Amino acid sequence: PAVSPDGEKLVYVKQVDHRLSLWLSGIDGKNPHSLVSGGMNLLPSWLPDSNRIVWMNTQPGKKGEAPANHSQIQIINTETGQTRRLFSDPEQITFTDAMPAVSPDGEKIAFVSKRTGTFRIWVSNLDGSDAKPISETNDQDPNLQLPIEQKVPAWSPDGKWIAHWEGVEMIHMSPFTGVKNPQRDQQISATFSVWLVSSDGTKRRKVGRGDDPTWSPDGFVTRAFPDRERGGPKIMIETSSGEKELPIVPHKRNWGRFCWLPE
């Protein structure tokens, strides 16, 4: 889900007839209606005007392939319903791009692209021009001999940092390969981590193990951290006095993505 910058609307993903559609409602959940259907629609991100939304549209691919392999970034005007492919720059329209996140000022977009061989975090102008990778890392995990990918970018409220997931893709784990290998699955999940990179790509640091980074309104990054004793993941947040748990997920429960509501 994603709350509009004016705090009045909520866009979220809803499964309808084995497809994932985008739905729009008031921040209180009233007046829900379908916004986008057809294919798999994920990871909506608002522009600052609180009218336009970009998102990732995915078409079916081969079994075992990552959804981002067949994705494009779309934009919709929620007032008119008009949609189009976001990137108009001629050099960019030939690439497959996914997982968009619009910068707080609406001038830049962070996204995931495989144009250099593996999924990396890229940043460009909103039309796709001046695109460049910003978070360099190793191409392969030395122990597993599998590609290291980067996904799920998230901008800090001040636009200076981008948090993202990094690790070996889940498609190499038993539920996707059909071959049970618990030890290998644990090795793969141990690679899941959240990183921070400056928006210009000059600075980078590891936050810790986990997935699905978000930012609190006051500029602290969160991550979903695996916890066997808890029977499911827990949400950790960095603070000025150290890291602590956000008690928002009940024990022994799975959860979906979450977003912060305006105060």
What are these regions (language model features)?
Residues P1-E263:
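Sequence signature of WD/YWTD-type beta-propeller architectures
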